[in-house]
């Protein structure tokens, strides 16, 4: 799995010279190409067939991080899910002294930790990483919980706004629907990076776009037809423009690289050759974000895909 953040040109372009939306990092000369550490026991030789040698462990997952750094990847996603595997923030802390260049994209499910203590925890990690920390804001359900989408995004909004107060102000004064704080000093939660780590965010619903456009830095998407990706970029950019902001954009993709397309398709068939449809559905449904709008769009895309699944 690879994450690519588009920030290489004056404007993001898809298909020839067509300009889509302005971006924040227009002065950079390369896109951020990132990797993925399989913290949630999802590293398989054959999809859906557990392999003891690839089971999520500190040794296996940290070796992925070190190898990604050796190959020059700029960032690496450390996902979060209630499955057999590694706790995200603990794992990132462990990687601080064994890496030097690669950034860590830590997935944080908003509400799991009290927001002010979360601000301090992230600030501590940011210092341990010497500023090589980025945060993927997650709004999915907690284990054993089913909450309405509107509530989950409101919770994420309030957590993000509290984090920003903690990282940019002298005191936290916050009056939200879920959280209320007054007169708390922010001295314990000052990060290494000015204003805190960059916030990456993915979501397709109107509350998700509003939250990302107002407060986050990178909007993450999944593979879809080009016209749909363009539409999503324009939608979140419209929100950002209301707040006189711009964003960068990222695409989460699974890539199989071979010398020819025929060889790539052959390997794609190989790695799914032992996966049963019912078990694949079970894997998807056990994730905390299985009922999200974005996941439902991916399911729709699978239904209209060709025999190779794309």
What do the PLM-derived regions correspond to, one by one?
Residues 69-70, 92-100, 122-132, 213-214, ...:
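Acidic (Asp/Glu)-rich catalytic clusters
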Residues 4-42, 149-192, 224-310:
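An alpha-helical appendage that flanks or caps ligand/catalytic pockets
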Residues 2-99, 175, 192-197:
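N-terminal beta1-alpha1-beta2 module of alpha/beta enzyme domains
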Residues 165, 217-218:
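Well-ordered beta-strand positions
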Residues 57, 61, 88, 118, ...:
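Aromatic/hydrophobic pocket-lining residues that form the small-molecule binding cavity
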Residues 31-37, 76-78, 104-107, 133-137, ...:
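Hydrophobic faces of well-ordered beta-strands that scaffold small-molecule active sites
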């Amino acid at each position: 799995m690879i994450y690519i953040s588009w920030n290489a040109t004056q404007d993001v372009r898809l298909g020839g010279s067509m300009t889509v939306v302005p971006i924040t990092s227009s002065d950079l000369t390369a896109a951020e190409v990132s990797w993925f550490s399989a913290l949630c026991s999802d590293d398989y030789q054959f999809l859906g067939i557990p392999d003891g040698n690839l089971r999520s462990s500190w040794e296996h997952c940290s070796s992925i991080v070190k190898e990604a750094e050796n190959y020059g990847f700029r960032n690496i996603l450390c996902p979060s899910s209630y499955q057999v595997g590694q706790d995200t923030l603990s794992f990132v802390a462990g990687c601080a002294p064994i890496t030097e260049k690669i950034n860590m994209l830590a997935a944080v499910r908003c509400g799991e930790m009290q927001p002010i203590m979360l601000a301090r925890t992230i600030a501590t990690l940011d210092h341990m990483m010497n500023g090589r920390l980025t945060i993927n804001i997650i709004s999915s359900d907690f284990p054993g919980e089913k909450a309405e989408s509107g509530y989950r995004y409101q919770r994420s909004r309030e957590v993000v706004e509290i984090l920003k107060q903690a990282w940019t102000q002298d005191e936290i004064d916050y009056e939200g629907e879920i959280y209320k704080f007054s007169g708390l000093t922010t001295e314990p939660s000052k990060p290494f990076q000015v204003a805190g780590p960059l916030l990456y965010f993915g979501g397709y619903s109107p509350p998700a776009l509003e939250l990302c456009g107002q407060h986050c830095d990178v909007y993450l998407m999944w593979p879809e037809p080009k016209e749909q990706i363009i539409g999503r970029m324009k939608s979140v950019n419209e929100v950002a423009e209301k707040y006189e902001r711009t964003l960068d954009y990222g695409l989460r993709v699974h890539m199989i690289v071979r010398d020819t397309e025929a060889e790539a398709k052959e390997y794609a068939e190989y790695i799914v050759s032992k996966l049963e449809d019912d078990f694949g559905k079970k894997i998807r449904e056990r994730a905390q974000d299985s009922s999200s709008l974005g996941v439902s769009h991916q399911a729709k895309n699978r239904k209209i895909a060709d025999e190779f699944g794309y």
